[in-house]
Swiss-Prot record:
Organism: Streptomyces lasalocidi
Lineage: Bacteria, Bacillati, Actinomycetota, Actinomycetes, Kitasatosporales
Top EC class of this enzyme: lyase
Biological role: Catalyzes the cyclization of 2-methylgeranyl diphosphate (2-MeGPP) to 2-methylisoborneol (2-MIB), which likely involves the intermediacy of 2-methyllinalyl diphosphate.
Region (Disordered), start-end ranges: 1-125, 139-160
Protein name: 2-methylisoborneol synthase
Pfam families assigned to the protein according to its UniProt record, in alphabetical order: Terpene_syn_C_2
Originating gene: tpc
Length: 481
């Protein structure tokens, strides 16, 4: 997703963003002391993952599928009738009219019936100044027979044998088609992201399916587009600065710093500001960052936008560590690699789930150490998923690419197969730790905004795995089974 020429005026107007939530200052985290939590850890986890039938992959010969682990709840279990999720809230009333989509793409409805995860997620604003932090409003849990089965055949793609994961319903095809149409128009007309010869790679990215799967509670396609533009922009920076299309570790720090100013603007003197502003249009990654962030800040609160900027700084720091190792030919220890991957990972994507969902997790609740642990574990687990599914793709690419199986094989003197299987075990342990930490936080702080955010992060983790599994254009599994 690279540069296709110098910046010029866009040939089409961008879609109108969803109305921003209220921008009241952050308040102290809510304290709940008088309402006991009735759901157990297992019940909370079961409520995150409605049952979905998928064809199963053959088990690994050296270890049983992780879903059989007795210490974790099965992904197909349902919460008992006594467990009630937070009640749905009224959807926000936008102060700006949404973009009128084609007749086939509903804009103002919540996720369709196929997005059954959203049936357990309250919709509407939960920002400051609303009633979202009230714990009095509850409703009965949706009974299992009220959850519609996914419509249509599931996309094909094998699951890594032994990988602990949760299947998801098929993403709404109407939303997928509309997001795909809009993001391609944005990439080609507004930011001119790639030359014509790279169009097939952009289409093969399947970002529309990706974002619809990861954000089942997004109230409109406009909200989905917030995440989709940012995802495409992040990948443009990775591809053009670090990886496939002209990327190099040499000079990466300077390129990343200047690109980051498209997210976190330079404040300087009148003499030098015009030159900086002009630089934001000098290449495709910066054009994409600038446009995607402009859309995002119009819909997000100031604290949500600042949260995203900090998470992107973390990502760029991880890029620089990996680049430094590439320049010197250093293969890190496994713990060093995992530390790098805690920064060079998907964290900026799930942590905008509240903005995409049309509500806000207040800054004080986001900053809680237990919430930060949940977010870190989710990002780490999803990033190892990427290592596992992109393993053969990276082996076939020029140069040496570090991923967890490669580092384990090198540092622990294991065969490629045994190292890959151990990486699966690392992923599974991270996933179990993420789910346990999320359940503990839900029990300790059962505030509706917290519960919804946790469900949003879990949905992103599941959708991210499903996209890797189904994207056979990009990924294939090694022949280890």
């Amino acid at each position: 997703m690279p540069d296709s020429g110098s910046l010029g005026p866009p040939t089409s107007l961008p879609e109108q963003p969803p109305a921003p939530p209220a921008t009241a200052p952050d308040a102290p985290a809510a304290t709940v002391t008088d309402r006991p939590v009735t759901s157990s850890v297992a019940h909370f986890l079961a409520g995150l993952h409605p049952p979905v039938t998928r064809p199963s992959s053959p088990p690994s010969p050296s270890m049983p599928p992780a879903s059989s682990n007795p210490s974790s709840p099965p992904s197909s279990s349902m919460p008992p009738a006594s467990w009630a999720p937070p009640s749905p809230l009224s959807p926000p009333a936008p102060s700006l009219p949404p973009t009128s989509p084609p007749a086939t793409a509903p804009e103002t409805s919540a996720a369709t019936g196929s997005d059954s995860v959203v049936r357990r997620v309250p919709v509407g604003p939960t920002g400051l100044g609303t009633t979202a932090l009230s714990l009095a409003r509850r409703q009965a849990a949706v009974p299992p027979d009220a959850v519609p089965a996914p419509s249509g055949p599931s996309a094909e793609g094998p699951v890594v044998p032994g990988l602990y994961h949760h299947p998801i319903p098929e993403p709404d095809p109407v939303r997928v088609a509309e997001v795909s149409r809009r993001i391609k128009r944005w990439a080609e007309d507004e930011v001119r992201l790639y030359p014509e010869e790279w169009e097939g790679q952009f289409d093969g990215f399947s970002v529309g399916r990706y974002m619809v799967a990861c954000h089942p509670d997004a109230p409109t396609v406009d909200h989905l587009m917030l995440a989709t533009r940012l995802m495409v922009a992040e990948n443009a920076v990775d591809d053009c600065y670090c990886e496939d299309h002209g990327g190099s570790p040499v000079g990466l720090g300077g390129r990343l710093l200047l690109a980051h100013t498209a997210l976190d603007h330079l404040h300087t003197t009148a003499e030098y500001a015009p030159e900086w502003s002009e630089s934001l249009g000098s290449d495709a990654p910066r054009r994409a960052y600038r446009s995607a962030m402009d859309h995002f800040v119009r819909a997000a609160t100031p604290s949500q936008a600042d949260r995203y900027r900090h998470d992107m700084a973390r990502l760029h720091l991880g890029y620089l560590a990996e680049a430094a190792w590439a320049e010197t030919g250093h293969v890190p220890e496994v713990c060093e690699y995992l530390a790098m991957r805690q920064f060079n990972n998907f964290r900026p994507c799930p942590t905008i789930t509240d903005t995409v969902g049309g509500y806000e997790l207040p800054a004080d609740l986001h900053a809680r150490p237990d919430m930060q642990r949940v977010i870190a574990l989710a990002g780490n687990a999803t990033t190892i998923v990427n290592d596992l599914y992109s393993y053969t793709k990276e082996l076939d690419s020029p140069g040496r690419h570090l991923n967890l199986p490669v580092v384990i094989a090198e540092r622990e003197h294991l065969s490629d197969r045994d190292a890959y299987l151990k990486a699966v075990e690392v992923h599974n342990e991270l996933m179990h730790a993420f789910e346990a930490a999320a359940a503990e936080l839900a029990a300790d702080c059962p505030v509706p905004a917290v519960l919804r955010f946790l469900r949003g992060v879990a949905a992103w983790v599941d959708g991210n795995h499903d996209w890797h599994r189904t994207n056979t254009y990009r990924y294939s599994l090694p022949d280890f089974w």
